[in-house]
């Protein structure tokens, strides 16, 4: 262990060569000595290198317009949400990179994000794509599985364990990752009236999430599950973890419309309600509306950025099927091409797939299962039948479960129903 030199003979710093009489302090190590001036200089060199690394990291960070452009390659529509997310994540990681080099004393607070939109509108996919663009660890949690500590269910700390696992247990990377908590609307307070039963999966979970959302040193069990006194914990600092929460918030538009449409008591109070367009409730959504829905003020206070996603139209879903880099149609085309089979979808088929997803209230989330079901027989047959050249999916395949049109390499074209026996 290093100790201050007190011997009578004068020693010299092993780094600069100055004797003890010319410096304030000299510390001895294992056969070497270092003076206070060299310690200060070493610290300055390290700080300068860290500052240079932080500046480089900031320069390498994609700008908001660049982030949105990359989001556009994978996510169709939702321009408002993409702009909000692009600015928010840019500011978040810029804040992190400047923390070590800012000497002004101005502390930049973390800004977590809430995404509000119907099922299948792209909330989870947006968060996933952001993490991919920024090359940071990402984890998804379902709020409905969480309970307050001490009750049956999953502790909120296990969300952090998922992030750590996805970062291959690289603690530094995990502490700069993104966590998406889905179905956040399902942990709203069960009722405004006081109940003798503790709300362990509603308000209790919101209370448990407060600290990790704001920034704390959380103790995480390395193998998951409940905490045990004798179990060694992993300490994770959540200060720089970006939390994105999402939910459908069914009925929130009525809360907004009622607030905007209310008039004071008097003539015309009942019949004079303002008409609120579909877009207006999204533009006028406030934190107060979310509190009215059932989120506690302390929870909302830790999620300052709120944006909404639109319900996807038939046109949007058709574009989702065909346009993004990893569009479903492109994926299945690639899959069948590995068996030397061309796959085509008619315009009628694409529209039928989109209409069916909307009718099932699944949005983009329902597209894959519809396409998968329509191609099941084809994917079963093509690996074994070498003479299949092309498969065409028509509207009837989607709506009436008809067989797709198959073209054979011998130029024999017939309905699959005639060929399959």
UniProtKB/Swiss-Prot annotation:
Binding site for ATP: 118-125
Keyword Disulfide bond among record annotations: no
Binding sites annotated in the UniProt record for Zn(2+): 13, 16, 35, 38
InterPro entries (UniProt xref): AAA+_ATPase, ATP-dep_Clp_protease_ClpX, ATPase_AAA_core, Clp_ATPase_C, Clp_protease_ATP-bd_su_ClpX, ClpX_bact, P-loop_NTPase, Znf_CppX_C4
A family per Pfam: zf-C4_ClpX
GO MF entries: ATP binding; ATP hydrolysis activity; ATP-dependent protein folding chaperone; protein dimerization activity; unfolded protein binding; zinc ion binding
Name of the protein in its database record: ATP-dependent Clp protease ATP-binding subunit ClpX
Gene name for this UniProt entry: clpX
């Amino acid at each position: 262990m290093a100790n201050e030199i007190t011997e009578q003979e004068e020693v010299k710093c092993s780094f600069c060569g100055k004797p003890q009489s010319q410096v304030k302090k000299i510390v001895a190590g294992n056969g070497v000595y270092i003076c206070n001036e060299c310690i200060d200089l070493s610290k300055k060199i390290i700080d300068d290198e860290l500052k240079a690394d932080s500046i480089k990291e900031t320069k390498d960070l994609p700008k908001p317009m660049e982030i949105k452009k990359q989001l556009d390659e994978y996510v169709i529509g939702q321009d408002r949400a993409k702009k909000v997310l692009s600015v928010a994540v840019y500011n978040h990681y810029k804040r992190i990179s400047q923390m070590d080099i800012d000497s002004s004393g101005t502390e930049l607070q973390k800004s977590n994000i809430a995404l509000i939109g119907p099922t299948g509108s792209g909330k989870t996919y947006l968060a996933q794509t952001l993490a991919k663009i920024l090359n940071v660890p990402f984890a998804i949690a379902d709020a409905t599985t969480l309970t307050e500590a001490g009750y049956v269910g999953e502790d909120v700390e296990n969300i952090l364990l998922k992030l750590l696992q996805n970062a291959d247990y690289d603690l530094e990377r995990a502490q700069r990752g993104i966590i998406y908590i889905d179905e956040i609307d399902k942990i709203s307070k069960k009722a405004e009236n006081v109940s003798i039963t503790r709300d362990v999966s509603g308000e209790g979970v919101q209370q448990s999430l407060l600290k990790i959302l704001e920034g704390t040193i959380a103790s995480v069990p390395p193998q998951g599950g409940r905490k045990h006194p004798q179990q060694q914990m992993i300490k994770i600092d959540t200060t720089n973890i970006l939390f994105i929460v999402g939910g459908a918030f069914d009925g929130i538009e009525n809360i907004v419309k009622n607030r905007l449409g209310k008039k004071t008591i008097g003539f015309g109070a009942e019949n004079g309600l303002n008409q609120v367009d579909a877009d207006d409730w999204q533009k006028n959504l406030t934190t107060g509306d979310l509190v009215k829905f059932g989120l506690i003020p302390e929870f909302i206070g830790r999620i300052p950025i709120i944006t909404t996603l639109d319900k996807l139209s038939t046109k949007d879903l058709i574009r989702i099927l065909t346009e993004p880099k990893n569009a479903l149609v492109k994926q299945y085309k690639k899959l069948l091409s590995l068996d030397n089979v061309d796959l085509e979808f008619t315009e009628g088929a694409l529209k039928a797939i989109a209409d069916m997803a909307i009718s099932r209230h699944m949005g983009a989330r329902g597209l894959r299962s519809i396409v998968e079901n329509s191609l099941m027989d084809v994917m079963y047959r093509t690996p074994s039948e070498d003479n299949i050249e092309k498969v065409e999916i028509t509207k009837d395949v989607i709506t009436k479960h008809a067989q797709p049109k198959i073209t054979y390499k011998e130029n024999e074209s017939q309905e699959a129903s005639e060929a399959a026996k």
